[in-house]
Amino acid sequence: MTLDVGPEDELPDWAAAKEFYQKYDPKDIIGRGVSSVVRRCVHRATGDEFAVKIMEVSAERLSLEQLEEVRDATRREMHILRQVAGHPHIITLIDSYESSSFMFLVFDLMRKGELFDYLTEKVALSEKETRSIMRSLLEAVSFLHANNIVHRDLKPENILLDDNMQIRLSDFGFSCHLEAGEKLRELCGTPGYLAPEILKCSMDETHPGYGKEVDLWACGVILFTLLAGSPPFWHRRQILMLRMIMEGQYQFTSPEWDDRSNTVKDLISKLLQVDPEARLTAEQALQHPFFERCEGSQPWNLTPRQRFRVAVWTILAAGRVALSSHRLRPLTKNALLRDPYALRPVRRLIDNCAFRLYGHWVKKGEQQNRAALFQHQPPRLFPIAATELEGDSGAITEDEATLVRS
């Protein structure tokens, strides 16, 4: 998807990025970050397409302290990406260049874009599709943790899709190495995906800190969001949303959960454990029944004639199943008037019509607020204190601050 170009998106001149331009030809903009622009680029020698993340690190836009922070964070990201290179579900760093004013990171081109955009288009995903995505994500997280790396910013915007709808985990700007027994105290990430221990750590100087478990909490939030189309923790006042996170307050009450299995709800509940010690690890999550495949018995030794007969009966049975599934069930007027959204075919019709009419998702229940997906602040470091947290109408009151601390 090509994005509009603004004045701040102008390409670096040849002199400032000669080494990059000699090898790659930058094209249209396909994404933007807080301090970067992502463009499609073409390798001049081979014609292969890639994605290049361009970050301006000039004194004109950043202070000396900010410049050093950006450079250090980018170098740390590059080091981690090289360490985890080769994993099928982690983005591959192809090339990197650094000049006095710009830094360039060249990655694989993921043509399907962000999982966030895909979810916005689909509204909610099926359990089958969610199972495939979450298995790949947990495998990537397990690999990171095995290498003593914590990501700290897992969310649909940082999960990319290739042509085959396979995921790649990206944006390792907040990632860091974490040795056994070591704890972190830095507050970073996106509010809706922050684990309770991160918030508590920022409010209590005596808190021991947090570890790799924060990534599994974020996985639980992502799993919930993919199936419901809206996040588990949301309130129009951010201070109350943070309290919901710290207390683990979420519900399976929206209409989408009527069709979801108890197995996936159980997995979500074990990932969204407020106590990090009780939370599943990535390896344990992958062993959950939600990811189990039905293993058949030993293959039969059939003659060619027997195999042919089995194939014929299978085709006939599949045809009957397909035919019966397309037959409309009787629909009474009273049932339609009483609760049209409870009927799955009508529900999909309502969703599709609403999306085409308004161009965005439409709220259908009191517990739903898909707008929360679009209201998350960019990843950043932000202190949480009574004098600094804000709601939708200004600074929070002392009573609200007490709610969070309690």
Swiss-Prot record:
It is an enzyme of class 2 (transferase). GO terms for molecular function: ATP binding; calmodulin binding; enzyme binding; phosphorylase kinase activity. The keyword Kinase applies. Gene3D superfamilies: Phosphorylase Kinase, domain 1, Transferase(Phosphotransferase) domain 1. Residues 24-291 form the Protein kinase domain. Keywords: ATP-binding, Calmodulin-binding, Carbohydrate metabolism, Glycogen metabolism, Kinase, Nucleotide-binding, Serine/threonine-protein kinase, Transferase. Residues 346-370 are annotated as: Calmodulin-binding (domain-C). GO terms for cellular component: cytosol; phosphorylase kinase complex. Its EC number is 2.7.11.19. SMART domains: S_TKc. It catalyses: 2 ATP + phosphorylase b = 2 ADP + phosphorylase a. The keyword Repressor does not apply. ATP binds at residues 30-38, 53. It comes from the Eukaryota. Disulfide bonds: none annotated. One of its GO terms (biological process) is glycogen catabolic process. The active site is at 153 (proton acceptor). Catalytic subunit of the phosphorylase b kinase (PHK), which mediates the neural and hormonal regulation of glycogen breakdown (glycogenolysis) by phosphorylating and thereby activating glycogen phosphorylase. May regulate glycogeneolysis in the testis. In vitro, phosphorylates PYGM. Belongs to the protein kinase superfamily. CAMK Ser/Thr protein kinase family. This is Phosphorylase b kinase gamma catalytic chain, liver/testis isoform. The gene is Phkg2.
